[in-house]
C-alpha cells in the first residue's frame, strides 16, 4: 500500500496516508453487557466505565452530526457492549435519523432486548440489525455466554424480522470443541427463517488475552464444513472491496452466507471504518493501541470545526494493517466489549 504525501488530500473526509476514506462509523454506546461470552469477557471482575466518563446522548448525537455533515460518514452502526442496555437508544436513533444527510443506521446486538424494542427502533429510523448467535443448542449457548438466554435471542430475532429491520443478519463465531460442528445446522436454520448468516473468525479481543491463532476455527474450516451439505457459489465477480464478508450463494440462491476472515484473509487495505468508544475516544482500528480523545474537546466547548480537525488528524495516522501476523503484535488493552464491534 502506497502512502500519500502530507498534503491532507480530501480535507473534508476522513482519509488516511494510504488513501483509504472512512465512510462507516461504529459508535459504542456502553461497555456493559448482559452476557459474558467466553471470547469477549471474563465471567466477573471487569471494571466498567464510570457514568461521568460516558458520552451523554447529546454528545453522541453531536459527534455523529459532525461526522455526517463535515467528515463524509454515510453509515452509522451502534454497538456496545450491548447497545440495547443504553436507556436513551431510541431517542438517539430518532435524532440521528433527522440529520441531513441522513446516514444509514444499523445496530449490532445480542438480541436479548429486541422483543421489546424492535418496533420502537424501526419507528425511530433504524434500518437493520446484526444479531450475535453462535449456536442452536441452549446448553452450548449457556456454556459460551455463561447465561441461560437462548430463547430470548431467538424471540428477539423474530421480533426484528417482523418489525422490518431487514435484512436481519446473524453473526456466528465458532469455537473449537464447543460449536465448531454447527456450521451446516446454523446455515440451514438461517435459510429457513430468512436470516442472512455470517461466520466470523475469532479475533484476539478477549479480555483474558487467551486467544491463540493455532486454536481458532478458520474461514477455510467453515467453508469445508458448509460444503458437506450445501453447494456454495462465490457471489459475482466483483472484488471484495471494503465489505468484510466474502459472500456465497447457497444452493444457487437466493439465500447467501458470508464468511468474515478477519485473521486469515484480512481486508485492511480497503477498510472504510472509524470507531468511537462509549467514553469518546476515536479508534482507527479494532486492534489499535492508540486512541484520540474527543470527549475532552466536547467538554471544553471546542467548536465543531476543531473537533472535526482532531478526528481527521487521528484518522490520517491510521496504520496500514492490524498486524496480526507481526511477531510484535500486541493485543489491545480494551476487550471487544469496551471497543464496539
From Swiss-Prot:
SUPFAM superfamilies: Radical SAM enzymes (SSF102114). Its cofactor is [4Fe-4S] cluster. Pathway: Cofactor biosynthesis; molybdopterin biosynthesis. It catalyses: GTP + AH2 + S-adenosyl-L-methionine = (8S)-3',8-cyclo-7,8-dihydroguanosine 5'-triphosphate + 5'-deoxyadenosine + L-methionine + A + H(+). PANTHER family: MOLYBDENUM COFACTOR BIOSYNTHESIS PROTEIN 1, MOLYBDOPTERIN COFACTOR SYNTHESIS PROTEIN A. Binds 2 [4Fe-4S] clusters. Binds 1 [4Fe-4S] cluster coordinated with 3 cysteines and an exchangeable S-adenosyl-L-methionine and 1 [4Fe-4S] cluster coordinated with 3 cysteines and the GTP-derived substrate. This is GTP 3',8-cyclase. The gene is moaA. It comes from Streptomyces coelicolor (strain ATCC BAA-471 / A3(2) / M145).
Amino acid at each position: 500500500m502506497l502512502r500519500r504525501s502530507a498534503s491532507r488530500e480530501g480535507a473534508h473526509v476522513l482519509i488516511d496516508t494510504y488513501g483509504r476514506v472512512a465512510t462507516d462509523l461504529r459508535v459504542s454506546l456502553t461497555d456493559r453487557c448482559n452476557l459474558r461470552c467466553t471470547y469477549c469477557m471474563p465471567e466477573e471482575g471487569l471494571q466498567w466505565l464510570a457514568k461521568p466518563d460516558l458520552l451523554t446522548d447529546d454528545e453522541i448525537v453531536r459527534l455523529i452530526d459532525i461526522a455526517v455533515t463535515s467528515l463524509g460518514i454515510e453509515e452509522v452502526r451502534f454497538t456496545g457492549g450491548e447497545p440495547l442496555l443504553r436507556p436513551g437508544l431510541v431517542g438517539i436513533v430518532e435524532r440521528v435519523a433527522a440529520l441531513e444527510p441522513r446516514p444509514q443506521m444499523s445496530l449490532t446486538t445480542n438480541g436479548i432486548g429486541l422483543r421489546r424494542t424492535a418496533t420502537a427502533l424501526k419507528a425511530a429510523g433504524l434500518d437493520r440489525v446484526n444479531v450475535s448467535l453462535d449456536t442452536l443448542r441452549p446448553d452450548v449457548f449457556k456454556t459460551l455466554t455463561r447465561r441461560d438466554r437462548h430463547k430470548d435471542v431467538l424471540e428477539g430475532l423474530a421480533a426484528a424480522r417482523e418489525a422490518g429491520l431487514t435484512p436481519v443478519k446473524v453473526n456466528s463465531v465458532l469455537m473449537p470443541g464447543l460449536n465448531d460442528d454447527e456450521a451446516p445446522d446454523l446455515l440451514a436454520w438461517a435459510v429457513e427463517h430468512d436470516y442472512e448468516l455470517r461466520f466470523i473468525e475469532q479475533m484476539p479481543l478477549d479480555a483474558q488475552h487467551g486467544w491463540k491463532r493455532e486454536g481458532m476455527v478458520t474461514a477455510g474450516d467453515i467453508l469445508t464444513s458448509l460444503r458437506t451439505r450445501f453447494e456454495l457459489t462465490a457471489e459475482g465477480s466483483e472484488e471484495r472491496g471494503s465489505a468484510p464478508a466474502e459472500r456465497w450463494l447457497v444452493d444457487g440462491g437466493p439465500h447467501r452466507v458470508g464468511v468474515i476472515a478477519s485473521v486469515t484473509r484480512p481486508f485492511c487495505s480497503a477498510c472504510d471504518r472509524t470507531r468511537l468508544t462509549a467514553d469518546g475516544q476515536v479508534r482507527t482500528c479494532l486492534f489499535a493501541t492508540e486512541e484520540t480523545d474527543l470527549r475532552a474537546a466536547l467538554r471544553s466547548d471546542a467548536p465543531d470545526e476543531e473537533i472535526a480537525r482532531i478526528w481527521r488528524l487521528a484518522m490520517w495516522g491510521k496504520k496500514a494493517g492490524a498486524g496480526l501476523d507481526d511477531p510484535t503484535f500486541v493485543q489491545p488493552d480494551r476487550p471487544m466489549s469496551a471497543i464496539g464491534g
